[in-house]
Amino acid sequence: MAEIQRSTDALWWQNAVVYQIYPRSFADSTGSGLGDIPGITAHMDYLDKLGVDAIWLSPFYPSALADGGYDVDDYRNVDPRLGTMDDFDAMVEAAHAVGIKVVVDIVPNHSSNRHEYFKAALAAGKGSPERDRYIFRDGRGENGELPPYDWESIFGGSAWTRVEDGQWYLHMFAPEQPDWNWDNPDVHEEFIKTLRFWSDHGTDGFRVDVAHALKKDMNSPEIAEVSPRDGANRIDGSHPLFDRNEVHEVYAEWRKVFNEYDPPRFAVAEGWVRPERQYLYASKDDLGQIFNFSFATKLWARNNFHEAIEAGIETAERSGSSATWVLSNHDIIRHATRFALPQIPATDQHQIAVDWVLRDGKSYTENRELGTKRARAALLLEMALPGSAYIYQGEELGLFEVADIPWDQLEDPSAFTSQNNGVLKGRDGCRVPLPWVSADADGSFGFSPADASEKPHLPQPAWFADFSADVEADDADSMLSLYRAALKLR
């Protein structure tokens, strides 16, 4: 295969193919059952041959893994189970040696409840400067025994947890993920330090988690009537919890930091906001780019793709940025499966897939032959479009969702909240460790070393043998070969 030509321009990201790595499920170098940073470095040749311009790492920071690493204990370190800072530096060096950029996840809406600032907030008590870094409120009721507001978290269950002194703290996701108070200057400083830290370690850019939720108006007259479950459903920036205009003041600060570097650091927003508002995040004075998730939620229909493409290009033109295209990621059911399930008009395709997973893949027929054909066509469409394409680990192998993970082996907290227990199976089916070799002598399809002391953190199905990287690399008609050819042509 001819050498891949990658852009060295400062605006490389505008037309890049970015490969998302979920580190705990990519490759395990130690036999712990968890993927790690050295495992990524060991497969840099694979990523180089695939032809990607950049890799984006989901969180690899110290964490209790209450939410797959998105509960961050320390924003400026590596989880010791996944490696060391020296390992990270070696990975960046290996990537840069072959022209691959490195993007890391940053999680600014919430920390973990083990972060040093949250521990200090609990110790300092009511009204303290330490507690003001988070969103604490007194409860309702005669003795404050009721939460400040009847809010349901995005994962289900209450969005408030009570602490020993009687106050309650806000967590729009899991209880282990207390929300930062972005009206506090200490919080701004914490993240400025973090952006500079990773930039100084050679990181080329950042993916910003829940970018639309940082700023909240807790004094809004309508605060009691809203909920984290609402989502960003307004076009004027007036929702007390989401997509507020003030969030762009934060990103203007960040843009100044990005521009301190040569070339300037890049950022992309995960912002589930109305199409009319996406351009704000993608402006050159803001983060610079925003994900377009239209492909990830639509039925397989020509008009749906047409609408998604037009909307994505319109956002890019309005912002002066580039469009983005996403078929799968770590939060949604793999597109090969979505395209293999019945496409029922006037139905939420995502919900069809969620119900299918809940029933261990038995509620609908998964037509894998059809799903594969559609996935191949979707790839070629995606690669032909202007802008950036984000691909998720394993989609280049044509992996389907693993629907039948036993309940007692699930890890995703959204499967275990008081509301969702037994009703939603979560996101683990797209986070199963990758199959690298078809021979299963080590019990992990090459994900872990043959002498591994632990099994992979999520179980792999037997059918992974047919989708392993070594098998597909030798098959000119495989999904992997198609991805390599499409990325080279692009």
Model-found features: residue ranges?
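Active-site and adjacent substrate-binding regions of carbohydrate-active enzymes
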Residues: 1-490
